[in-house]
Each structure stands twice: as structure tokens, then as C-alpha cells.
Curated annotation (Swiss-Prot):
The gene is cbiT. One of its GO terms (biological process) is methylation. Belongs to the methyltransferase superfamily. Bacterial-type CbiT family. It comes from Salmonella typhi. It catalyses: Co-precorrin-6B + S-adenosyl-L-methionine = Co-precorrin-7 + S-adenosyl-L-homocysteine + CO2. NCBIfam families: CbiT (TIGR02469), PRK08287.1 (NF006138). Pfam families: MTS. S-adenosyl-L-methionine binds at T15, G39, A40, G41, T42, G43, E62, A90. GO terms for molecular function: cobalt-precorrin-6B C5-methyltransferase activity; protein methyltransferase activity. It is an enzyme of class 2 (transferase). Its EC number is 2.1.1.196. Gene3D superfamilies: Vaccinia Virus protein VP39. Pathway: Cofactor biosynthesis; adenosylcobalamin biosynthesis; cob(II)yrinate a,c-diamide from sirohydrochlorin (anaerobic route): step 8/10. This is Cobalt-precorrin-6B C(15)-methyltransferase (decarboxylating).
Length: 192
């Protein structure tokens, strides 16, 4: 989905189109029935997942009041009745397990969020995280190794977009984004 389709607001983050496409692919939602989107922002990941997989139940968690309003407006705009919005900050108490968890950031609670996400995944469930900070990348990778996550994969996405400049065009660079994906396997993720 094009980024321009989503309602946006100042200081409300959105997972961009190319990053979203890669993250959704790595979540392997074709075999999922429940996705948790932590720090849903505008809802771009939740909405694209819900539209691609209409039988998927999506739980979108967001703490920012401005983002919650945009998330709800975008959910209504795209008529996504399969998205439940949970106001609040993860880690939080929620019932049930998921087949996939997406984290678009950590809010300063990275290892606690990873543990929380793994605890809410069914065996075989997928966790996908995106970061722009190198420190978060290294901390996440080290913690995932420590807890025994399986099928770990990491990609750095560096995109540039063709942009007008005077009478010509140039490729305007975007910041690199790190995408980490892993899986919870039964008897492979140790209790902390």
C-alpha cells in the first residue's frame, strides 16, 4: 500500500511502505490467525495486514493519544473490522496467544518487550522488529541469541527515492532501517 493512502499526523511514526512490505513478508501471516502490533502508530502495519488477510485478527497496541486517534481514523477509513485497538504501553497484560508479533520500536524497554512478545507467541510464532538505532539492533540480536530464538534473520534496508531537484532529479537517501525476524520454537526459547 502506498504511504499516501494513510492519514498522517505530526510526531506520529509510520512504518514506511518498503519497510512494511519486508516486515509483513517476514511475519509469514499466510499461516497466522492473530497478529499483535506493538506501537502501532498510524496503523499502517495493522491495516495492511488486516486487508491482505481478512480472517486475521489484529491487536494494535499504542500509547500515544494522537496516534490512537489516527489509528482509529485509519481503521475506519479502510473498514478494518478485524483490528482491535488497545490503548496503553507494552509490556501489558493481554489474554491469548498470537502467531505473529510486530514491534516498530522499543520505547526504551527493548529486552522486556522481546521477552513479553516471545511469551505471547504460540510455538512457531514469528517476531519481527524494526530499528533505526545501532544500539537497539545489537541489544536485540544479543538478547534473541541469549533466549534461544530460532530462524533468526537480520536485514539492513537502505532506500533512496527519486526526487526532483531544479531541472533534474536525484536519489534522496533515507535513513537505514534494520529488520530483525525470528521464530519461537517449542523447547527452544528458555525461560529467563
Amino acid at each position: 500500500m502506498k504511504d499516501e493512502l494513510f492519514l498522517r499526523g505530526e510526531n506520529v511514526p509510520m512504518t514506511k511502505e518498503a519497510v512494511r512490505a519486508l516486515a509483513l513478508s517476514k511475519l509469514e501471516l499466510h499461516r497466522a490467525s492473530h497478529l499483535i502490533d506493538v506501537g502501532a502508530g498510524t496503523g499502517s502495519v495493522s491495516i495492511e495486514a488486516a486487508l491482505q488477510f481478512p480472517s486475521l485478527q489484529v491487536t494494535a497496541i499504542e500509547r500515544n493519544p494522537a496516534a490512537l486517534r489516527l489509528l482509529d481514523e485509519n481503521r475506519q477509513r479502510f473498514a478494518c473490522g478485524n483490528i482491535d485497538i488497545l490503548p496503553g504501553e507494552a509490556p501489558m497484560t493481554i489474554t491469548g496467544k498470537a502467531d505473529a508479533v510486530f514491534m516498530g520500536g522499543s520505547g526504551g524497554h527493548l529486552t522486556a518487550l522481546i521477552d513479553w512478545a516471545m511469551g505471547h507467541l504460540h510455538p512457531g510464532g514469528r517476531l519481527v522488529m524494526t530499528f533505526i538505532l545501532q544500539e537497539n539492533l545489537h541489544s536485540a540480536l544479543a538478547h534473541l541469541v541469549h533466549i534461544g530464538a530460532c530462524r533468526m534473520d537480520c536485514v539492513q534496508l537502505q532506500l533512496s527515492s527519486l526526487t526532483p531537484l531544479g531541472a533534474g532529479h536525484y536519489f534522496k537517501p533515507n535513513n537505514p532501517v534494520f529488520v530483525i525476524a525470528c521464530q519461537k520454537e517449542e523447547n527452544h526459547v528458555r525461560d529467563i
